[in-house]
Regions:
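Membrane-lumen/periplasm interface segments of multi-pass, membrane-embedded glycan/lipid transferases
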Residues: 145, 158-195, 336, 340-422
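Membrane-interface micro-motifs in multi-pass membrane enzymes
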Residues: 176, 180, 204, 225-269, ...
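Transmembrane-helix motifs of polytopic, lipid-linked glycan transferases
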Residues: 202-229, 262-266, 417-422
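Signature aromatic-anchored transmembrane alpha helix within multi-pass, membrane-resident enzymes
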Residues: 282-288, 411-413, 479-503
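Membrane-interface alpha helices of multi-pass inner-membrane proteins
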Residues: 285-303, 308-314, 345
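Perimembrane helix-loop-helix junctions
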Residues: 308-344
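Membrane-embedded, lumen/periplasm-facing catalytic core of multi-pass transferases
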Residues: 496-565
Length: 643
């Protein structure tokens, strides 16, 4: 147990009647607020009357909303007994078995009734996949290229801000509160501990390679040497690195990218019959539902994929117009309406599923996602918000070093070349006007959340997952032109941009690694200094520690404004004792704990007379608490309002 609120889980067999819990090694007092057995979606509350003393327990006091347990003064291994509600558990198991049996029976009945149709569908799908075998033979090559660009992330292990909390997380329902129910499913059933080296990044390398194959196919292109050369721009763009800075995001983002690409493939192929469908056509509604269902899963992985798909969909329509200047306005309008319906239907399915998960698991929405939305700023200053968003978009698409820390100017040349060549090759001004409108929509869609958030830097750069697609798409438009000079210039720009992207990865990896090494060394030195102050007759097995202020780490490598890359655990939030202590536990100093806010308020005055680290007296022992002063300015947790 740590000081503060703890949520603990334990697994047991069906026939278990009692559980013995040994909460602490030594004496102490603790309160239980809630105790329940969780089976699938059901929470069976264990009444306080079913909690009894077992060994070294002085007394148990039961209150309406909690139960207080006090151990004996000389206790070494106190324990309590918890009686499990076996009758209710067996009832839930029986009900679940009946529901599963009903589902299995329904599936078998459906398969038997639709056997011939399903067999035809299976044959068609098998033929399609077989026809694409030559295309997918290049998948190992793409995976190899991806692994080359992500080599440091694959071979290293550099945790950053928030990873320290995720390592100890046992309850993954936090993701449901953020509206990322697909992340909850992936973390709960596939990768319960996502903060590990190699595997998450390797999954991303495979996923981004598969997604790229699907993406190229959705645009009706072949995987020629040109599109292979374009792959690094899509796969290694810094946006992905910013997301991968948090290990817990990687699996969900990888799966979300695949689902988004599959939705785009269906959308692209179905556009050929857009003029033939009627509004009440069953096939039309079925296609809408299938695409909305797949895309809703992608949104459940990472909400920004809705804007990514919107950008991709506009790109597909733009490509159709670029390739066929005689295309009718009716086709364009119907295509845009079709895209709009898919987006709306996917959002409807996403929010319905989100509501269902929150209802089943009893989780309410937290303020993390909603905190990014600032409609008040948009309504009060719409002009300023739009202008600042356009300015930020310009800096990102031109590869400004102010955004990425290093220059990525070559990608800006690729994007501008694609735009200019597409407009130049248009047959008349009407086509150019149509292309220009579609281009603007495609380019600005990844920044829709920035507009809703109130403008520049209101949204982390990692959320702009549509940007790599936009740059790849316009680069592909340029390189597909059958002109030797243009091909040479684009190829040269590609080589330069690939080098610049690899340089960006190298710089980000350097700042992450150096910051982590400094934090580890600082943690070890602080722990050593604490141990020198421990009295010789001390028998405590753990120690209370509080940190005041921050100790920033400044180096020559770039820091990204909205990213945790290079963020120090001793500097975040102006110095956050909970983060610092949790980080120290991760690297092995597991016998230290933080203090609660009440005790922190009582002790904050002692910091006034203490010098700043690394002075000799920058660590002080007050009663049983070690106070560590890292800086002069109080962090968020030491900024108490005067009463």
């Amino acid at each position: 147990l740590q000081i503060g609120e703890n949520k603990l889980t334990a697994h047991f067999l069906l026939q278990t009647k009692f559980i013995r819990w040994d909460p602490v090694n030594g004496s102490g007092e603790f309160n239980i607020k809630a105790l329940y057995v969780k089976i699938l979606f059901f929470d069976i509350i264990i009444p306080y009357d079913d909690i009894a003393a077992n060994f070294d327990i002085e007394c148990i006091v039961k209150y309406p909303n909690e139960i207080s347990i006090l151990t004996s003064d000389e206790s070494l291994d106190p324990s309590i007994l918890i009686k499990l509600p076996q009758g209710k558990i067996l009832s839930i198991y029986l009900l679940t078995s009946l529901i599963l049996a009903a589902i299995i029976f329904t599936v078998i009945l459906f398969l038997s009734e639709n056997h011939r149709k399903l067999k035809k569908l299976h044959t068609r799908l098998s033929t399609k996949i077989y026809d694409e075998r030559a295309f997918f033979k290049k998948l190992p090559l793409l995976i190899s290229i991806a692994c080359l660009f992500w080599i440091f992330s694959l071979t290293g292990y550099s945790i950053s801000i928030d990873d320290e909390l995720a390592i100890f997380r046992q309850d993954h329902s936090l993701w449901i509160g953020q509206g990322r129910w697909a992340v909850f499913l992936l973390t709960e059933f596939i990768l319960p501990q996502p903060i590990i080296p190699f595997l998450p990044h390797f999954i991303f390398c495979v996923s981004v390679s598969v997604s790229y194959l699907i993406l190229v196919r959705a645009h009706g292109m072949e995987l020629s040497w040109k599109n292979i050369a374009l792959f690094p721009i899509f796969m290694a763009f810094p946006t992905w690195y910013f997301i991968a800075g948090f290990y817990a995001n990687i699996l969900a983002v990888s799966m979300g990218l695949i689902f988004t690409s599959i939705t785009l493939l269906i959308f692209s192929h179905s556009l050929s019959k857009i003029n033939e469908w009627k509004i009440l056509d069953k096939t039309f509604f079925l296609l809408i539902f299938i695409q909305a269902f797949i895309l809703s899963i992608a949104i459940g992985c990472y909400q920004s994929y809705i804007f990514c798909f919107l950008s991709m969909g506009l790109g597909i329509i733009l490509l159709k117009v670029d390739q066929n200047s005689s295309i009718s306005n009716r086709y364009i309008i119907r295509s845009l309406g079709y895209l709009f319906l898919i987006v709306c239907a996917s959002l409807l399915l996403y929010y319905s599923t989100d509501f269902t998960f929150k209802f089943i698991y009893g989780v309410s929405s937290n303020t993390y996602i909603s905190g990014f939305i600032n409609l008040e700023a948009l309504l009060k200053f719409p002009g300023d918000v739009i202008v600042s968003t356009l300015h930020e978009a310009k800096q990102i698409y031109l590869g400004s070093s102010k955004i990425f820390g290093v220059s990525l100017g070559a990608i800006g040349c690729l994007l501008l070349t694609g735009v200019i060549l597409s407009l130049y090759s248009a047959s008349n001004w009407k086509v150019r006007a149509t292309l220009l409108i579609l281009m603007f929509g495609c380019i600005i869609s990844p920044f829709a959340l920035t507009i809703l958030g109130g403008g520049t830097r209101s949204i982390p750069y990692r959320s702009m997952v549509g940007v790599p697609y936009v740059i790849w798409f316009f680069s592909a438009l340029a390189i597909e032109r059958k002109n030797t000079v243009i091909t040479f210039l684009i190829t040269t720009s590609l080589i330069i941009s690939s080098f610049q992207i690899m340089n960006a990865h190298s710089n980000y990896s350097a700042v992450k690694q150096l910051t982590l090494e400094r934090d580890k060394a600082l943690a070890a030195e602080i722990y050593y200094r604490i141990t020198t102050l421990i009295p010789g007759n001390d028998k405590l097995s753990s120690y209370k520690v509080d940190f005041f202020g921050s100790k920033p780490f400044n180096n020559i490598f770039p820091r990204i404004a909205t990213s945790t890359i290079g963020g120090s655990f001793f500097d975040w939030d102006g110095g956050n004792p909970d983060r610092i202590v949790t980080f120290m536990k991760v690297i092995g100093f597991d016998n230290i704990n933080t203090i609660d806010s009440g005790q922190r308020r009582e002790l904050v005055g002692f910091y006034d007379e203490m010098p700043v680290w690394p002075s000799v007296d920058s660590i002080k022992m007050v009663d049983t608490v070690f106070l560590v002063k890292l800086g002069e300015r109080p962090g968020l947790m030491h900024q108490f309002k005067e009463q």
